[in-house]
Amino acid sequence: MTQAVDIGTIQTLIRLEVPDQVPLTGSIPYDALVKKLKTPVDPELLQRLIRFTRLVGFLDEDAEGAVKHSPMSAIFVNDPDTAGQARFMADFGIRPCSFIYESIKLDPSGEAARQGPLALMAREPGAREGPTFFEVLEKDPVNRKRWHDGMAVHNDSMVRHVAGAYDWGTVQSLVDIGGSEGHVAAVIVNAFPHIQITVQDRPEIIEKARQRGDRHPNIIFEEHDFFTPQPRIADAYFLRLILHDWNDADCTRIVRQISSALRPGARLLIMDAVLPEPGEGSLQSERRLRRSDIGMYTLFSAKERSLAQMRRLVEDCDSRLRFEKLYTPPGSHASMLSWICE
């Protein structure tokens, strides 16, 4: 109950856009604050909410009882990218969790995206299934932008580990599948300037990437749907933070489409979180990874996978693929797994 109240109250204030209406310096009385909100709320009720959240560090009051920012809530004014992530989580990260039980009743496997927690949250009243995560975002440009901005922040914090995650010196040509606007490719090619990299993604993302003025000459961009056959022949194919967004059946489709292009000696490289065995590693690390696993389930009906699960998924797609190694760069939440085609 304690954490539910903490999370639910802060979520409510974020969705009411209260932090946006509080001045960064100074304060604002409750009567004036409620007049700025798009959603009507009684000043006394708003006061009750804020007088609770101030005790956990979100918003505060001055000596006269007017509302002012705390360091945590000031992020909504000072840091738009992080604020966008918080708003996205208020809409999509928390609410689907209350549909987990209902989702299990409809889909005990946890694999049906249209009966997953988020789909049930977004469904029409009385329906037994709903839209997928990506379909929801397609109709919600505000949260779509928050999602992409959040992914950019997340990627910026993790990209630095990519250059040291694999011996890129042995690779001459690389296909970065689902590589967005080429941020990861740029890190690799700046550290290993001999590599020729093809970045593949959806048409609208590739169009945006091509408009950037800082493209490296060794990076080319190509429109590609990874559920269709891979058109490029290369030394290595790279899936970074892709498979954890998809259930096992869809991951099998993705890997098999790459398999059609593999030649002897080519490598499949997958960089994703790898779930530990229970009790393996630190409690903090395991908690973070398993929280991510449940997050993938609630949003996508997907999962984080253990090494055994990842190997089984890949090697069942193509018997020519022999597992080589797993390497986790120091400080990274994701590991690099490599297979060679024999």
Curated annotation (Swiss-Prot):
Disulfide bonds: none annotated. The keyword Metal-binding does not apply. It catalyses: 6-hydroxytryprostatin B + S-adenosyl-L-methionine = tryprostatin A + S-adenosyl-L-homocysteine + H(+). Pfam families: Methyltransf_2 (PF00891). One of its GO terms (molecular function) is O-methyltransferase activity. Coiled coil: none annotated. S-adenosyl-L-methionine binds at D201. 6-hydroxytryprostatin B O-methyltransferase; part of the gene cluster that mediates the biosynthesis of fumitremorgins, indole alkaloids that carry not only intriguing chemical structures, but also interesting biological and pharmacological activities. The biosynthesis of fumitremorgin-type alkaloids begins by condensation of the two amino acids L-tryptophan and L-proline to brevianamide F, catalyzed by the non-ribosomal peptide synthetase ftmA. This is 6-hydroxytryprostatin B O-methyltransferase. It comes from Aspergillus fumigatus (Neosartorya fumigata).
